[in-house]
Amino acid sequence: MVMQERNSNEDNKVNHGIDNIYVLELDLDGSVLFASTNFSQITGISSLELTGKPAALLSSDQEIFNAAIEQLLDDDSHSVKIHTVISKLPSLEENVFVQDEEMELQSKSVELDCVGVLIRDPLTSRPSHTLWVLQPLKPTRITRQEIGQQLTETLGFGAQLLAQHLEKLQTVPSTDSLPPFETVLCRVCDHEIQNWYFEHHTELCLLIHHAEARAQEANDLLNEQRNALQSLLDSLDDQIEPDVSYLGVPLAAVLPSSITSSAKSNSRSSLSQKIRNYISNMLFDAISYTDSCLAIHLPFIPESTTREDNQPFSEIRLLSPASEVFNAKTLSWCLPHIDDPGLQLMFENTDALVKKKLDAINRLSNIIYYSERVRCEIEDQVQTIIEQSIQVDGYDEPLSTTTPTLIEPIQETLMTQSPIIECEPFNTVKPSVSPEEVHDISQFNHRNDPPITAASVDSSNSFSVHRSSTNHSSTNSGSPNLSRRNNLAIPIASRRKSVSAVNTLYGVGSSYTSESFPFSKLTVPVERNSFRETESPKPFLSRQIGISTLSSNISSGKGTPSIQDYEIIKPISKGTFGTVYLSRKNTTGEIYAIKVLRKVDMISKNQVANVKAERAVLMAQEESAFVAKLYYAFQSRDYLYLVMEFMNGGDCASLLKSLYTIPESWAKIYIAEVALGLEHLHRLGIIHRDIKPDNILMSITGHLKLADFGLSQLGLTTRQLRLQKGKNNILSPPSFQSPTALGDPGDNIASSPLILPTSVSAFSYDEKSQKQKTELATFTTYKEDDTTTTTRTSIDSISSKYLESPVDSQKVNRTPNLQSVPFFRQPDAPKRFVGTPDYLAPETLRGSTQDDMVDWWALGCVLFEFLFGYPPFHAETPEKVFENILANNIAWPDLEMYPCSEEALDLINGFLQPNPERRLGFSDINEIKEHPFFNGINWDDIFSHEAPFIPAPETPLDTAYFDSRGAGAAESNMSSSVNSGEEVSKDNNVSQERGSQFLRSSHGRSRERSTSARRSRRFSEANSEFDEFGPFSYKNLSVLERANRNAIEKIRSEIAGKLHISPPDPHIGYTPGSDMPSAKLYDQQLTLSPSLMTNQGSNFSSTDSTPRKSINSSDVESRSKTDGPKSMHDLIKQLHMRKHSSHTNQSTGSSESDDLFNLDLPISNLETSYPFKIEEGQASPLSSPLSKTPPFFSSSVPLKALICVSKLNLFSELIKLLKSYKFQVSIVTDEDKMLRTLMADEKFSIIFLQLDLTRVSGVSILKIVRSSNCANRNTPAIALTPTRIDINAAIPRMFDGRLYLPINAFLLRGYIARLCNK
């Protein structure tokens, strides 16, 4: 396992919206044990530096945290809430401006609302530490006396909604007709949440899901380590001498004395056997250790469960009994004392990964416990307020009447509806495990999929929900700012201790009608004998008014994606390994493209590594503007599901098929956009390796995105390897991290789900005993007529006919090469090259290192095909294609028939250089950008200009641009699969036997290497239901969080009494769930008739009836004279006239993702948003941004805009837009003058400030302005970021918005309307 820091490119990726929520752990003395990374935004000190320091140094009231801890120690049955002010010292860069003696920099203070709970040690039940969640104090306009000051501050604007609901209750004649609360769908967990609690729920929900993502990542890392150890164990069977290494360090180089003492007396074969057994035993120990940890599943609370009403809150179980046993077993494991460096490194890395997962689960457990406790206390307070309000209004119905109540049993359908999540019933017989054996996460429930991202915490900081059985009376000593959450401004008539909290926690009341639970669609038939009749108090009124809608616990299985959450509309396209379906999400009506892959096909065709790589790449680019987005990933027993953007513009192969060739002016823009996308990928260490027209998709705006990362390689590029060679003996790949999985301080193992140092490419064994291979190249995985074929032979011996052979027919044990092995490389896979034959680089065919230069070669092939209509090395057979590539025999057409500029020819020749070191782009991307072919291209704002061709689908569901490729035959199969619950129910039965299988397989040990290998494989099979693919689960939290934030803003606007729609961030299109109809994009194009642009793969197929890539001269001439377009108008007309054309050619893609088509934005509420209408003041992004002044803007005063940037030419488009909106624009490029201008007496209407200035950041400049009393202290400020690399950087709270290149006119207009029209 290679330890390394995060890649610098990832440091700026902070998830939107969660930056104002801080997590803090304090020991009982008030010292900091842990602080979330974003806490440094308040303190100015990094989280690592903050660890160990007293919390008293942070707060203006030095005793407030200690007083709160004392109250928690006295009685931890409730949380404690405090208000404090934390001051931030000026950073070093701000001191640059402290040159004028008259100017003093003021410190930034933040008033925080802090809520803490006590955490107890699971072994001793003694207090261990406290957990705090801090957030800025929410200002409220109205404080309702009937609600109470403290609850008003906690709920923010939700308190006004609650007060409005209380007013409604006063008009209700009886308790039988109490109105339910209005609810809002949480996009993160898919629960309907009451509107007054929605904002608070969003914060807690995001905390839980980000912690869950970290736990998932940690599990992925551990699972890859286990696979690497298993491969090492298997390799012992294939060697005469046990010569195995881990991360380049030989294993068993230093033998124990028991083996060395008998070395002389034993024969060589006997000694080798002893060494082999010794290594095998060590590997088996490490594998057993990882299996124990992998068997521990994510903690979560089920939707409903059978419980007693008097069950204490502390007895909530978040782990299954089996997971508790595995947890105790894992914690009891000790590192063996070994002198051998290789084995010691192996055990240390394994132990670090195990602890990383345990710590991640531990922290997730703490957050779940905290969230549920806080939620229950808030609900308890609201419950009491409502009951008192009804009693005061004179209801005669008693609230404490004793009546028979039926306790509903576990709803198994709710707990098994997802193919990923399984809830183990609480009535399962518990194993005989003593409290000493059940360690820190002993109170968690069971989840089917292995937990999964990473947090760093010392494992001694255990979590437990045990607390003292004695409930002390509440005291309120200490600081006057300290207050109990259960102390309301009005007295609570019936403090139900933790009973009502547990009632709501377990969903008691779920048997009520759908009016109380409008979000619940799943019901379970109730058998009379399954109920238990008891005498209990009458249910609280909250159950009658729907308050327990709030009780939907955040981490339940309902929040996990499942195919049953979607309506399958129709198939879009069918490929070799699966089918893409147009689908609508049931809860929101949004449109997605779901890629469905059959597991059996993926395994038999050796595509497991490819689909893993594709998911990993997409996860790392949640909001990339260059890559089609992945929203969800999940699996069932038989299928994998990738929920993607639906890009109804088709792909470039469709465009080529309709036009035959693409005009050079169009090709210039398209190639430039693809080049920017490749630059983005290469900076992240990602090599696409399958660039071709089929994998270049077109959005609704006509701009391009890359797709199909099934053949991608993730790791160091050759240039990165050259830079690192000589510095370290072991080369480590760059670290990646999904913005969803925000890391914590101390993540020193690996912070990424992408690059796993413990994959098989990280270890090697000696190849001396292996048979030397003499082939020039090995060929594998081509698709022809939906058939995967594989051959391994030399280029000279390839037969004239393309041969087929089983995928796994030849398996070679070899030394994996870190420089050329693709991510998730299977240890027994044959050495191979990957890609589509027509676009393969010569170094790929020769079997040499494949680095990022192969993508530039492929881009040259794409440019050639754009201009001439066929690939440059096209031939009748794949063998001849390979020969042409190696000989650099480019099939140039007659340039008189296909006129082309000298610059285009030079660019093609530059890309198609056989020597990678002479190929264009070898030095850097600037070689390409500065080429004369791209003269006139503004690389900084290319995406802001109108595309050459803009698709015009007739409806949001229009798939006329796609070739179904026989997908219609799969529609019935998919429908039956989705509608049948058989597969899901079967999935949930698998893990019922895991615990017993694991325990049975762990007894005893075989000393024979083959037996050990077989047993370790059985370990894996018993431990993971989805062993081949691992925990295939993912949510794009960045997009879902933004949807929640938009909903919150909408509620706020409604409360304020005026309509205010916050413009969405342009880099993700319109946010899912946004009320702004995304279908407005189609409005101005409805008069155009879309062309039917069917897809044809760009791969070679000898059976094509009308091959697009033929270079027959007569065909070229005929096409040029009859079908060739003569002008841009003719091109567009030609596209429109092809709407009803039919192409029957079958495509032959090179990877399973050829059929992936995506859209720039999910489209919601299609039935109500179509036909489309653009409201006044909501101009379509497709309209000209300079056409008119924003009609929604009105101001009687002159508008002044100040632009502070270092390079004026980068933001020329912004200046044009502002001037078109009648602004007086002032521009400052000198950084010192920026501060003086802002501090002067002239007041501006709006400020645009660049963040990444040369000497000091724009954040620091604005800090000084905000802390002063100058005229622009409160002037709205927009942050400017020159590149899309900063796309995931959070907006500093002092800014009012953010713009990045290319400037989005629609977003700018929204900012102007919101900030300058007051």
UniProtKB/Swiss-Prot annotation:
One of its GO terms (biological process) is positive regulation of G2/M transition of mitotic cell cycle involved in cellular response to nitrogen starvation. Residues 1116-1127 have a biased composition (Basic and acidic residues). Residues 972-1000, 1091-1115 have a biased composition (Polar residues). The active site is at D690 (proton acceptor). It is an enzyme of class 2 (transferase). Gene3D superfamilies: 3.40.50.2300, Phosphorylase Kinase, domain 1, Transferase(Phosphotransferase) domain 1. Residues 566-934 form the Protein kinase domain. Residues 935-1044 form the AGC-kinase C-terminal domain. It is found in: Cytoplasm. Residues 431-485, 968-1022, 1058-1078, 1091-1127 are annotated as: Disordered. ATP binds at I572, S573, K574, G575, T576, F577, G578, T579, V580, K595. Residues 1200-1316 form the Response regulatory domain. Its EC number is 2.7.11.1. PANTHER family: SERINE/THREONINE-PROTEIN KINASE, SERINE_THREONINE-PROTEIN KINASE GREATWALL. GO terms for molecular function: ATP binding; protein serine kinase activity; protein serine/threonine kinase activity. Belongs to the protein kinase superfamily. Ser/Thr protein kinase family. GO terms for cellular component: cytoplasm; cytosol; nucleus. InterPro entries: AGC-kinase_C (IPR000961), CheY-like_superfamily (IPR011006), Kinase-like_dom_sf (IPR011009), PAS (IPR000014), Prot_kinase_dom (IPR000719), Ser/Thr_kinase_AS (IPR008271), Ser_Thr_kinase_AGC (IPR050236), Sig_transdc_resp-reg_receiver (IPR001789). It catalyses: L-seryl-[protein] + ATP = O-phospho-L-seryl-[protein] + ADP + H(+); L-threonyl-[protein] + ATP = O-phospho-L-threonyl-[protein] + ADP + H(+). Its main location: cytoplasm. SUPFAM superfamilies: CheY-like, Protein kinase-like (PK-like). Keywords: ATP-binding, Cytoplasm, Kinase, Nucleotide-binding, Phosphoprotein, Serine/threonine-protein kinase, Transferase. Residues 462-479 have a biased composition (Low complexity). This is Serine/threonine-protein kinase ppk18.
